[in-house]
């Protein structure tokens, strides 16, 4: 059907193109509007992951310049509205930008958000097991995240934007940053710095002689 080819397929491809930009900008806007420290930490971690991935890619290009790929700032592989605007800021309209073979900043961004969400399900396992947060919601989020990852990886590889090696390395790099970043922040802040869901935290009172979980501050 023409509508599927001309509109739905094009809309899907464009949304996949700008997916990392959408996640980054959405998180940054929420951090500004809500002034919520946990959202600010998530946004800062995402931006830091992108910067670190780009730095690693620059080192790869420095030691293996032949592996770099030239791309136009208007290329579909450059990114969406944020990526293209950033590219145009430092380059004339169609000037080529050099991209490393690995790691993929695109996949690193998706890996960061996915792994950070997975880390939260472990950090707040006691609350989830106690029914404070519905488990079916987490399962649904996990399924959606997996589908998006597969679609994004397929899109980038089929479009020639990434090699399979670069995409997987970027995904693992971002996942490591998201997971360990969340775990470290949770340990440093008593799990309050990662409580994006705003769920009441439970405290183990076994050491006090009672096998009861209660909300902190209500003893």
Give the label of every model feature segment.
Residues 1-219:
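Terminal transmembrane helix and immediately flanking juxtamembrane interfaces
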């Amino acid at each position: 059907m023409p509508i599927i080819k001309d509109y739905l397929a094009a809309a899907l491809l464009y949304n996949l193109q700008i997916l990392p930009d959408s996640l980054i900008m959405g998180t940054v806007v929420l951090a500004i509007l809500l002034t919520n420290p946990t959202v600010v930490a998530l946004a800062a971690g995402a931006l830091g992951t992108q910067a670190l991935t780009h730095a690693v890619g620059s080192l790869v290009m420095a030691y293996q310049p032949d592996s770099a790929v030239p791309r136009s700032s208007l290329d579909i592989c450059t990114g969406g509205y944020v990526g293209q605007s950033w590219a145009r800021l430092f380059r004339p309209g169609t000037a080529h930008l050099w991209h490393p073979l690995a790691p993929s900043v695109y996949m690193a961004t998706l890996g960061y958000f996915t792994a950070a969400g997975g880390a939260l399900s472990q950090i707040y396992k006691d609350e989830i097991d106690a029914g404070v947060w519905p488990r079916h919601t987490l399962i649904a989020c996990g399924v959606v995240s997996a589908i998006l990852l597969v679609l994004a990886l397929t899109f980038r590889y089929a479009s020639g934007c990434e090699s399979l090696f670069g995409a997987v390395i970027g995904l693992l790099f971002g996942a490591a940053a998201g997971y360990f970043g969340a775990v470290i922040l949770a340990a440093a802040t008593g799990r309050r710095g990662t409580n994006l869901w705003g769920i009441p935290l439970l405290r183990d009172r076994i050491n006090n002689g009672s096998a009861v979980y209660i909300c902190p501050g209500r003893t």
